[in-house]
């Protein structure tokens, strides 16, 4: 053709239409066959659930159905006789190699080799998208998991929670949900004060000051490691006379929680603003180790939510105020109690102690209130034994 251009039918990127792989839905196909069989027998009004289970033993086929046993009572027939009739209808499927009747009337279905190959092709063509769907349609779900106190290394129980939580979050994301993975940092309570005190006491030991170490403080080698880091960076900057630390505490029995609280109060008084440095150093060291362990484990979080931020923002005070307005609190023995038994709990819970100190339960309520203020459709909490 003069001045023209001959096209021999070459395929280019512009004229290729990519056809997504089509998933063979065997269960839906078999359900349609059985529905038609019921319709032919005038049984459509029964509206039974037709379910297919995966047999535990390969010798029982690829799918098993108990529809015949569901029909036995309304039809007043033996399940095996009904199963035989249904098996005839199923045998017409091009996906089935054979259909067997087993036991009291189970219908066992065996797929053909070509049907299995068809599904294998679908898996290969789907690639990384295999198993994904849009079932969640972008619904916002938050999964909070692990959330171990940052007062020491993670243990096997935390690893179990991490594996379970991360797997669940991945499955939900693959199903089309908008998933937020969140770790709640308990950085505002007494346990963090105990960690700070423990670290400081080990630091004093490195400076030649060796006060008696409380038996109910944190004993792990990781506490000594943190003390060494502080000593290496600051030498004797945070040293104070140990006798001042034990003022008024000596009268309290050693090893009691009251004695430990007295040491914490004295440490805060002696260190002043430096106490915040010891506290935050210990917190950040433990959180850093936690993050690294989880990352090596293949677990990451979009949000690390600080409990302390709820106090700083007034979130805890707001939550307690809302409970008071709703008449969900009452006073007893000088403490404020939440009527949790009204909601199925085994006992009511203290939200504010007689000394005015708010409990973990109060900040947990504030945390849940914060979660639902973010526009989440659903919240999933995965707790370990230390959260009970």
Where is each model-derived feature located?
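NTP-dependent nucleotidyl-transfer catalytic core
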Residues: 9, 45-65, 70, 77-388
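Charged, compositionally biased N-terminal leader segments and the immediate start
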Residues: 10-52
């Amino acid at each position: 053709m003069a001045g023209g251009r001959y096209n021999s039918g070459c395929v280019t990127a512009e004229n290729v239409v990519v056809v997504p792989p089509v998933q063979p839905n065997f269960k839906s196909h078999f359900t349609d066959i059985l529905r038609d069989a019921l319709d032919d027998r005038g049984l459509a009004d029964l509206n039974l659930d037709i379910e297919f289970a995966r047999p535990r033993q390969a010798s029982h086929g690829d799918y098993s159905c108990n529809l015949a046993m569901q029909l036995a009572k309304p039809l007043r027939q033996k399940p095996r006789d009904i199963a035989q009739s249904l098996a005839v209808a199923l045998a017409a499927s091009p996906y089935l190699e054979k259909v067997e009747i087993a036991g009291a009337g189970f219908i066992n279905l065996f797929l053909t080799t070509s049907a299995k190959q068809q599904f294998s092709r679908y898996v290969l063509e789907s690639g990384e998208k295999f198993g994904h769907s849009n079932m969640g349609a972008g619904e916002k779900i938050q999964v909070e998991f692990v959330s171990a106190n940052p007062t020491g290394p993670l243990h096997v129980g935390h690893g179990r929670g991490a594996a379970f939580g991360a797997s669940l979050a991945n499955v939900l994301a693959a199903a089309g949900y908008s998933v937020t993975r969140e770790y709640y940092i308990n950085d505002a309570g007494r346990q963090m004060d105990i960690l700070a005190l423990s670290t400081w006491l080990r630091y004093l030991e490195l400076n030649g000051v060796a006060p008696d170490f409380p038996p109910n403080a944190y004993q792990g080698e990781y506490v000594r490691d943190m003390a060494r880091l502080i000593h290496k960076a600051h030498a004797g900057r945070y040293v104070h006379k140990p006798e001042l630390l034990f003022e008024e505490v000596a009268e309290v029995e050693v090893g009691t929680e009251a004695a430990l609280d007295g040491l914490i109060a004295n440490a805060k008084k002696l260190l002043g603003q430096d106490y915040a440095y010891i506290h935050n150093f210990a917190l950040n060291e433990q959180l850093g180790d936690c993050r690294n362990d989880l990352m090596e484990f293949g677990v990451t979080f979009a949000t690390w939510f600080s409990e302390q931020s709820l106090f700083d923002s007034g979130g805890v005070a707001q939550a307690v105020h809302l409970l008071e307005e709703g008449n969900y609190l009452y006073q007893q023995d000088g403490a404020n109690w939440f009527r949790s038994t009204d909601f199925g709990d085994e006992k009511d819970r203290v939200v504010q102690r007689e000394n005015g100190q708010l409990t973990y339960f109060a900040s947990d309520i504030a945390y849940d209130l914060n979660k639902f203020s973010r526009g989440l459709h659903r919240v999933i909490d995965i707790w370990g034994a230390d959260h009970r």
